[in-house]
Amino acid sequence: MDPQNQHGSGSSLVVIQQPALDNRQRLDYEREIQPAAILSLDQIKAIRGSNEYTEGPSVVKRPAPRTAPRQEKHERTHEIIPINVNNNYEHRPTSHLGHAGLSNNTRGPILSRSTSTGSAASSGSNSSASSEQGLLGRSPPTRPIPGHRSERAIRTQPKQLIVDDLKGSLKEDLTQHKFICEQCGKCKCGECTAPRTLPSCLACNRQCLCSAESMVEYGTCMCLVKGIFYHCSNDDEGDSYSDNPCSCSQSQCCSRYLCMGAMSLFLPCLLCYPPAKGCLKLCRGCYDWIHRPGCRCKNSNTVYCKLESCPSRGLGKPS
């Protein structure tokens, strides 16, 4: 019984071991076959198609909501990019063909489809770029023409405006000067009868007043006398003393003149102040006589209103 049991057990072992080996081999084969089924061409096509679909229209949709000047910038970039893309697509088929010979036959049509879609996209971009180049090529010569016209208009306009302003000012002057003197025939308004002062200007970055009065004061050192009287006098009377140190109508006239006489020993230029002041008054009178357009009569109280409708009417006495 022992040898039979041994043979039986041996035969049963053989029967049990062979299926085990077959199952392992089948599992190995199934594992090898399953990755091929997972990495199918349909799945690869779906991934490629989704990527190409997202990359293609997104470039076209971006410049749509933007403003006009920004679209011009993108148009210029599209003009440069398709040339490089075409060159890449022209060189890519050779590289893909080389890889296709080495790789499996299943990947060949996938690469050919991608290149075909890329060439279609490049052809569409080329057509859009060529149309944009035509538009851009025509636009530059039209832009400088209105620019030159505007510059010419700006150069010619100020002359016309100046003439209009002068005419308007003359009309306003004619309407303002209505009251005229009966004796001299000149206007008696406040602007025309006001005395004219000597011209002055600001120097040293508009910090110093340059006028005839200031030249006389600084030339004769009278500014030092005004400064001393301002600091030595009281607060209530300092303004009057410093402004008019040579006035005879104010109080303490003798003390002020004695002080200026003592200062003239050290500053002899103070002696030139009285004649310089007289020359200044004479210059003021001459300038006022020449440039004052209004009436100078003192006792002419009779005036009449100028009639705009009758400008050539003679002067008549008021009723």
Swiss-Prot record:
Residues 54-157 are annotated as: Disordered. InterPro entries: Sprouty, Sprouty_domain. One of its GO terms (cellular component) is membrane. Residues 69-79 have a biased composition (Basic and acidic residues). Its main location: cytoplasm. Forms heterodimers with SPRY2. Interacts with TESK1. Interacts with CAV1 (via C-terminus). Belongs to the sprouty family. This is Protein sprouty homolog 1. It comes from Bos taurus (Bovine).
